[in-house]
Swiss-Prot record:
Its EC number is 2.6.1.87. CDD domains: AHBA_syn. This is UDP-4-amino-4-deoxy-L-arabinose--oxoglutarate aminotransferase. Catalyzes the conversion of UDP-4-keto-arabinose (UDP-Ara4O) to UDP-4-amino-4-deoxy-L-arabinose (UDP-L-Ara4N). The modified arabinose is attached to lipid A and is required for resistance to polymyxin and cationic antimicrobial peptides. The lineage of its organism: Bacteria, Pseudomonadati, Pseudomonadota, Gammaproteobacteria, Enterobacterales. Keywords: Aminotransferase, Antibiotic resistance, Lipid A biosynthesis, Lipid biosynthesis, Lipid metabolism, Lipopolysaccharide biosynthesis, Pyridoxal phosphate, Transferase. The modification N6-(pyridoxal phosphate)lysine is found at K182. Homodimer. GO terms for molecular function: pyridoxal phosphate binding; UDP-4-amino-4-deoxy-L-arabinose aminotransferase. NCBIfam families: PRK11658.1 (NF008658). One of its GO terms (cellular component) is membrane.
Amino acid sequence: MSDFLPFSRPAMGAEELAAVKTVLDSGWITTGPKNQELEAAFCRLTGNQYAVAVSSATAGMHIALMALGIGEGDEVITPSMTWVSTLNMIVLLGATPVMVDVDRDTLMVTPEHIEAAITPQTKAIIPVHYAGAPADLDAIYALGERYGIPVIEDAAHATGTSYKGRHIGARGTAIFSFHAIKNITCAEGGIVVTDNPQFADKLRSLKFHGLGVDAWDRQCGGRAPQAEVLAPGYKYNLPDLNAAIALAQLQKLDALNARRAAIAAQYHQAMADLPFQPLSLPSWEHIHAWHLFIIRVDEARCGITRDALMASLKTKGIGTGLHFRAAHTQKYYRERFPTLTLPDTEWNSERICSLPLFPDMTESDFDRVITALHQIAGQ
């Protein structure tokens, strides 16, 4: 369908094209100076001392958990209402994911659910800043300090999000995503921010074969041509082609997120006349990045199931998303944790639907979505 409206579309323009051309013309297209520029720029955004660019947020999560020494016999607490990559990385390191419930209305993991899951084997807590809103960091970090457990913030949805006046990440260690649907994108990529220099050094080594330096450092830093392997590592570095796009996007972040916020405000106003329930906003002071606009489709209230709504919108040429099917209901995790029940996560997992939301979305696009929702609700 030529006029299909996707639920997300990257906002690319002349700046990104120029950035790519600059890198191509430079003769150095893999990890190099643009990575360094991106890391410095992201530190200015979040207020952290160190940033490590990686090939994806999943890669960032993998090496962050490795840098903490997570392994066999350890437990890591995280909500089930998250993308499965976090659970996968925990399992692949030999540790056990301890999935906890979320608040029914905000879909934020709560400190009460986290504390109830803490055991002597708990070695990390991973809160998720869901859909662009922040989790309650004061309470979560207080738990980490009380029990001596590191906190790694899953900030994949949170570029531009702030909590009580500070950008997400400023409290410690956080992982951001530059995936194609995120608030800023370079197709694929991510970045880890931290204030711990030893942790940052571990990340840099783990992301590039376990070497002490990367190819650009050897090229321009006068180092020996063959670097030393400090410990086995991975190939998770971000090419400068991608870093240059991310830099161009980062310069537009305020404008991109302002447009997202404007569309979200229009959605909230329109929902007053519709039976679909948006997520509630957290009660603490925050700035929402509006990565997603999510409604809950309860058949008893709306007269239609979520899946039927998504199918109906598709026939009208409108795309939607599901963020997320609860991780513990996926086949592998369902079979591994057959007795796990998380009532509020499960209730929402069966009803949530992400509506189209992206900076280049026009007023006509928005009107089309709302008209379709009215038509479906009136059937």
